Amino acid sequence: MSGSYNFLFHLIGFGLVSAILTANITIERKLRSETDWGKKLYIGGIMKTFGMFGPFVTVILLVTGIGNIHNLYMGAPEPWYTQGWLVAKVILFAVMATNGLVTAPMLAKKRMVLIKSLSDGSASAGTESTLKKMNTQASLFLLVQVLLLLSILFLSAFGTGKHPGMF
């Protein structure tokens, strides 16, 4: 049995992304259902903790993905970018990573500021309606991330190339 540790770490990275997304979906639902503003602030802190793993997991997937491409196309007569499924996968990963590393922190920070103002009573008149819009944006963000992850998984499973070092 031959295998690549690089491929194994890539699978671990994919599992971490899946775990972070699942945890964020679960915590998002809990945040929306909670009525106490203090508990909502606490739950938001938990979400921030999970969000801190995002850059680490992105680096793991980026480095191991580059390693997998190198292993797969080392000595091949054609370059990797001639494979449409692989180019699509790289583009989807770039969109997902940018979305997760840029959009998510901005959205979470704005939402927590609104919840904090509602918690301490310094909120203006339209804050709750703004918070509802932000909650909808957060749900849409998670839906887009899940769809991107499933698209990447689909391309990995049904793409024309085989990953190096399949166990």
PLM-predicted stretches and their roles:
Residues 1-167:
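Polytopic transmembrane helical bundles with strong interfacial aromatic enrichment
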